[in-house]
Curated annotation (Swiss-Prot):
GO cellular component terms listed in the entry, alphabetical order: cytosol
GO biological process: regulation of DNA-templated transcription
Family to which the UniProt record says this protein belongs: Belongs to the TACO1 family.
Subcellular location: Cytoplasm
Superkingdom to which the source organism belongs: Bacteria
Alphabetical keyword list: Cytoplasm, DNA-binding, Transcription, Transcription regulation
NCBIfam families: PRK00110.1, PRK12378.1, YebC/PmpR family DNA-binding transcriptional regulator
UniProt name for this protein: Probable transcriptional regulatory protein A1S_1496
Molecular function, one GO term: DNA binding
Pfam (any one): TACO1_YebC_N
Presence of keyword Transmembrane: no
Length: 249
């Protein structure tokens, strides 16, 4: 759980630093369009769509904008050429990296992603080179740890696979298939999550204890996330307490 907490801290810090509201909107709109295209327009029966709609609302995207994106998805307008492609590679220190993209031009995306790896002493790998180190799962988080007992009762009854509790959050873990059901059950019980999404979770961690390597890893993540075509970046990095303190300084 320590690794999850450390990485959560880095993710939160990164989110606070990300001032590009327009870029965030663009990425969420692409995800909404694709989620609606693949799973339908009803968030109640489309967990992927519901998760991204909640994220979009959290950054103050209007309902009108969200609904237009959903209609684009189900109507097939302007998105027929949009493809989901995942790239895999390694950063310094043997850190595994999964890069989920949504692109209409692979000739643009591949060089852009490769450039990020090469500029930070990493390597873009082939399909399957690191994917086996990650597991797809649902994660529902709560910042109020005083709700532990109630969350545990409701989530496990609804089919959650596991619950992890740290000093600052409760993490409910589900299979991708039961993610929506567990989320519904928690909401029906009056338990509003602080974040809910289906992610690629690392099964093993690569610990970084050197601050220079840590900065290279963070630079790689930042460069990838700044690319317009990139939707999500997942790694198996775990920073030591000393390195984490220096990164947060």
């Amino acid at each position: 759980m320590a690794g999850h907490s450390k990485w959560a801290n880095i993710k939160h810090r990164k989110a606070k630093q990300d001032a590009s509201r327009g870029k965030v909107f663009t990425k969420y709109i692409r995800e909404i369009v694709t989620a609606a295209k693949l799973g339908g327009a009803d968030p109640a029966s489309n967990p992927r769509l519901r998760a991204v709609v909640e994220k979009a609302l959290s950054v103050n995207m209007t309902r009108d904008t969200i609904n237009r994106a959903i209609q684009r998805g189900v109507g097939g307008e302007d998105n027929d050429d949009l493809k989901e492609v995942t790239y895999e590679g390694y950063g310094v220190g043997g850190v595994a990296v999964l890069v989920e993209t949504m692109t209409d031009n692979l000739n643009r995306t591949v060089p852009d992603v490769r450039h990020c790896f090469s500029k930070t002493n990493g390597n873009l790998g082939t399909a399957g080179s690191v994917a086996y180190l990650f597991t797809k799962r649902g994660e529902i988080t709560f910042d109020d740890i005083s709700l532990e007992d109630k969350i545990m009762d409701v989530a496990l009854e609804a089919g959650a696979e596991d619950i992890e509790v740290s000093e600052d959050e409760i993490l409910v873990i589900t299979s991708p298939e039961t993610f929506g059901e567990v989320q519904d059950a928690l909401a029906a019980a009056g338990l509003k999550s602080d974040n809910a999404e289906v992610v690629m979770s690392p099964s093993t961690k690569a610990e970084i204890t050197d601050i220079d390597q840590a900065k290279q890893v963070m630079k790689l993540i930042d460069m990838l996330e700044d690319l317009d075509d990139v939707q999500n970046v997942y790694t198996n990095v775990e920073f030591s307490d000393e390195v984490l303190a220096q990164l947060d300084a």
